[in-house]
Amino acid sequence: MQWASVLLLAGLCSLSQGQYDEDSHWWIQYLRNQQSTYYDPYDPYPYEPSEPYPYGVEEGPAYAYGAPPPPEPRDCPQECDCPPNFPTAMYCDNRNLKYLPFVPSRMKYVYFQNNQISAIQEGVFDNATGLLWVALHGNQITSDKVGRKVFSKLRHLERLYLDHNNLTRMPGPLPRSLRELHLDHNQISRVPNNALEGLENLTALYLHHNEIQEVGSSMRGLRSLILLDLSYNHLRRVPDGLPSALEQLYLEHNNVYTVPDSYFRGSPKLLYVRLSHNSLTNNGLATNTFNSSSLLELDLSYNQLQKIPPVNTNLENLYLQGNRINEFSISSFCTVVDVMNFSKLQVLRLDGNEIKRSAMPVDAPLCLRLANLIEI
């Protein structure tokens, strides 16, 4: 009997110790489960999401102890998802929607991409004027079915995605708060001078893959613009008055045949310029057109140039392949060639021209001493 009491007491101690060990690690299981359901509110929009819903990708209980996660609020449209752990986002993408559903007032991020929406009716966002991001790309929206003031009331809107639609005109008016505007892959033919009026906070403008023939002076007031993409259009002239803050300019695959003298002087921060696949000739370029000290990369490939245009010694990458260049002028890179004066050029592409490697002048290695790739 005495031994039985001892064994019973030992068993109880062992059971108590085992329960204590399990409970002492409950917080680890809690953190693991919390991490599995975590969703980053500042990365709510992968442009090409690999999963239809980036939240809740791991299955399993959300909590090791306590109540389950709260259900979706009742104000969420039945066609959409409103994750409880990110209450200001509404996901209505890839649902074959033909209309825009009601948007609750608490929403900051709404995603309607990849549907069959053809209209943005007036007042559809009046209940949610605090929206920051609106994604409407990959739909069938036409300009005549976009309410004129549908976006102007969104005074906090920062990003607007209207690319890959059927727009033929610039939307507007747009709110001053806008920072990114995506209008690429539409059928827009022109940008009126007042189309972007008041967008002083805009930093990136995507208008590539449209049918734009002219933009006039519509870019003049965009004092914060850093990136301008007008590639794959029908432009014959470069935009008038580039913004002073501009760093990246993409104009490839147009019909541009001339660039004015000192055109880039008003943009002292400009780093990258792409003008490939245009109709540029030496007659359409002034002597100092590309002599900008800020430029790091210049792409003039696949034009109709016969001579290498003069560039600044600070330029690092120059692409001239696919032209009609028939001579190698070292003065295009170095006005004076000596030990102290040389070009910072690292990449020079001259292949696909009418020039041979033997045409390189003897002082080329001294001028282009930093080059690690010269293709002829």
From Swiss-Prot:
Any signal peptide, and if so, which residues? 1-18
Sum up the protein's function in the record's words: Affects the rate of fibrils formation. May have a primary role in collagen fibrillogenesis.
This protein's assembly is summarised as:
Binds to type I and type II collagen.
Q: Where in the cell is it found?
A: Secreted, Extracellular space, Extracellular matrix
**What PANTHER family has UniProt attached to this entry?**
AGAP008170-PA, FIBROMODULIN
- Gene name of the record: Fmod
Q: In which tissues is it expressed?
A: Highest levels observed in knee epiphysis, in calvarial and diaphyseal bone, in nasal and costal cartilage, in the eye, and in bladder. In mature knee joint it is mostly present in the proliferating zone of growth plate. It is also observed in ligaments, especially at insertion sites, in the junction between meniscus and joint capsule, in the perimysium of skeletal muscle and in the periosteum.
**Keyword vocabulary terms for this entry:** Disulfide bond, Extracellular matrix, Glycoprotein, Leucine-rich repeat, Proteoglycan, Pyrrolidone carboxylic acid, Repeat, Secreted, Signal, Sulfation
What name appears for this protein in its UniProt entry? Answer: Fibromodulin
**Which GO terms of the cellular component aspect does the record hold?**
extracellular region
